Regions:
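Aromatic-rich carbohydrate-binding modules that target alpha-glucans
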Residues: 9-61, 71-98
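A general sequence property marking short-to-moderate contiguous segments
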Residues: 1-3
Length: 99
């Protein structure tokens, strides 16, 4: 009988998405990590106009956008972006395995 080899998955890391210029009632982040569904809602916990949410992601590259009241927008604080299949741009996030 052969011994089973266990494949260790890289640990997921907590990533904070932050959007400061979002005068909207519903603020979400969507990307390849959520099948482009706006599942992760950002909240303004302190009432200062700074919306945040934490998402657990494995190391890798992720394309994403913010969705503010149904309008898709780039992350203006992130200078990294790539073209998408719709002729617009997506923000690009690199999550490393470093601690």
């Amino acid at each position: 009988m052969m011994a089973k080899k266990s494949v260790k998955k890289p640990a997921r890391r907590s990533v904070t998405f932050k959007l400061e210029d979002a005068p909207g009632r519903q603020v979400f982040v969507a990307g390849c990590f959520s099948d482009w569904q706006p599942k992760h809602r950002l909240t303004d916990r302190e009432g200062r106009g700074v919306y945040t949410v934490r998402v657990l992601l494995a190391p890798g590259e992720y394309q994403y956008k913010f969705v503010v009241d149904g309008e898709w927008r780039l992350d203006s604080a992130n200078p990294n972006f790539v073209p998408n299949d719709f002729g617009t741009l997506n923000s690009l996030l690199r999550v490393t395995a470093d601690k």
